[in-house]
Amino acid sequence: MVDGNNAKKTVIATGIGNAMEWFDFGLYSYLAVIISKNFFSQVDNDQLKLVFTFATFAIAFLLRPIGGIVFGIIGDKYGRKIVLTTTIILMAFSTLLIGVLPTYNEIGVWAPILLLLARVLQGFSTGGEYAGAMVYVAESSPDRKRNSLGCGLEIGTLSGYIAASILVFALNISLTETQLNSWGWRIPFLLGMFLGLFGLYLRRKLEESPIYENEQRELQKHPTREPIGVFTLIRFYYKDIIVCFVAVAFFNVTNYMVTAYLPSYLEGVIKLNGTTTSIMITCIMVIMIPLALMFGRIADRIGEKKVFLIGLGGLILLSVVAFSLMQLQSLFFVSIGVLILGFFLSTYEATMPGSLPTMFYTHVRYRALAITFNVSVSLLGGTTPLIASYLVSTTNNPLTPAYYLTVISIIGFIVIALLHKSTASKSLKGSYPNVDNEKDREYYEKNPEQALWWLKERQEKEKF
């Protein structure tokens, strides 16, 4: 049996890492202009400065798959806790590094080089962070509460972005432009380091996930089991990898469309004031927190597959409607358009952390999820702002981002409807059930075939 209260503490300790990742993401986005002035001052063109700044930002996405491979292997071999402790240390250090870096005027070309190294370190550590957090929470939560607890990781995402927005807004109204450009921009990054240290303090108190410990005991009984490489992993689990890749894709395309692309879209295309845009996006994210909690509970009751399809179906039908409302340039209708996207994004925020780890067996779960997740994010999620802005600039059609989102949602709907099997309230593949009450324990004792529902599938895939 697992302790429900300990599971909640686990969500908080792991969610802080996710909050820190998106706190950094938000800071870099909001402070991009100031960062470009400090680290690329030798570039005469302001637009080119921003290009270099965002190119440095994009480097992190290229390193995520490598981090996923390295930390995934470590996490499956040596445990989930050691990886989560390591990644948050690296994230805290890289955040501190950005906050204390000398500018180009002080050390010349070494300034952008060191900024690039800090972003490389962030990307590498992030590659193991989020997948590890999902795995750890899923393995530590009662099966019947996996989605409602797992969505706490995405609450961390929203909270980190909201905190970055509020902090940058506070600096803008409390400091002069000269102060902000000179030293004020460093404050949020220094505060981010303390957030990371607090997360490290909480994570050091965590125990290893019970499911991983059970797997290690089983491994001692079967010491001759051969290690599974990446190609063997693909061979045995290609269907699960496809479903996971597509799920991560439609989740992150929607996520980056709302969080990364919409601010610049509303300013550049819809011609809204920058401050108004920031406040609007922040308010929508605040609304998304209770929505994610609600959909997490619903997913535990009716199954995550149905909640996936609600989100996908809604975006297929209403993405164009949402972007069309934004074209009216009325603050009310623009807000409704953004809220529509945020509402359906909440269905993914609620279900992804608790569902993605269930697609793989315990002995390969960390590396399979880390590699698949980060490759999908790097190829499709992180490129969403670039693709959306390219579509608008080349077609002169402000609705093309909606068409892109619709196409991705249609693909997701087909894959989830045909290939995904709901695992809500079921035990994780390769493990015994996680229960937090006597009633469930007695049920599985009387119905062992329900407890080990995955056994037949595993026997067909592997020989032990």
Curated annotation (Swiss-Prot):
Gene Ontology molecular function: any one: symporter activity
Superkingdom of origin: Bacteria
One Gene Ontology cellular component annotation held by this UniProt entry: plasma membrane
SUPFAM superfamilies registered for this protein in UniProt: MFS general substrate transporter
Keyword field: Cell membrane, Membrane, Symport, Transmembrane, Transmembrane helix, Transport
Protein's UniProt keywords contain Transcription regulation: no
Biological role stated in the UniProt entry: May be a proton symporter involved in the uptake of osmolytes such as proline and glycine betaine.
Record family assignment: Belongs to the major facilitator superfamily. Metabolite:H+ Symporter (MHS) family (TC 2.A.1.6) family.
Predominant localisation class: membrane
One family name in Pfam for this protein: Sugar_tr
Transmembrane segments: 15-35, 54-74, 82-102, 107-127, 155-175, 182-202, 241-261, 276-296, 307-327, 328-348, 368-388, 399-419
Gene that encodes the chain: proP
The protein's name in its UniProt record: Putative proline/betaine transporter
Organism per entry: Staphylococcus epidermidis (strain ATCC 35984 / DSM 28319 / BCRC 17069 / CCUG 31568 / BM 3577 / RP62A)
Subcellular location per the Swiss-Prot or TrEMBL entry: Cell membrane
Membrane topology designation: Multi-pass membrane protein
